[in-house]
C-alpha cells in the first residue's frame, strides 16, 4: 500500500463574468507573474472578439465548442520494456484532456506573430472552433502518433 498522502485538489473558483470554472481555469493557465486581472481582461476581450467574428450570441457555447474540438482522446506515453522504449497509446482522463487543450491553444496563440495577444487568442479560438489551426494540428499529430503505435497497447499499465 502506498505511504504517500493523497494530494488535496485545489478548488478552482468560477470567474466573475461567465460564472464558469473552465474560463477561470483558462485565465489561470494564461497568467504570467500572478497578474490574473490582465490575463482575465485578455481572455474576456478575445472571447468578445470571437463572438463578434462569428456573430453568435452565446459566447460560452462558442468557447466550449472551440475547447472541445482540441481535446485529445488518446496520447502516447513512454514505457520501457526489456531495454527498449515503446510509445504506448493510453486514453486521456477528462481533466487532462481539458488541460492539454487549454495549453495547446495558449501556446499556439503565443507563438503566432504580430498583433496583440487578445487578437491572436481570438484567432486561435476561431481556428479551434472551425477545427483548423496549430492547436488542432497538435491534437491530430497526437492522435496519429497513438494510431501508429496501436500495436503496443498491450503494454498499458
From Swiss-Prot:
Gene Ontology CC terms, in alphabetical order: small ribosomal subunit
Keyword Ribonucleoprotein carried by entry: yes
Keyword Protein transport: no
CDD domains: uS7_Bacteria (cd14869)
Source organism, top-level taxon: Bacteria
Gene3D superfamilies according to UniProt: Ribosomal protein S7 domain
GO biological process: translation
A single GO molecular function term of this UniProt record: structural constituent of ribosome
Residues that span the membrane, as ranges: none
Quaternary structure (record): Part of the 30S ribosomal subunit. Contacts proteins S9 and S11.
Similarity comment: family membership: Belongs to the universal ribosomal protein uS7 family.
Function (record text): One of the primary rRNA binding proteins, it binds directly to 16S rRNA where it nucleates assembly of the head domain of the 30S subunit. Is located at the subunit interface close to the decoding center, probably blocks exit of the E-site tRNA.
Protein name (Swiss-Prot/TrEMBL): Small ribosomal subunit protein uS7
Species whose genome carries this gene: Borreliella afzelii (strain PKo) (Borrelia afzelii)
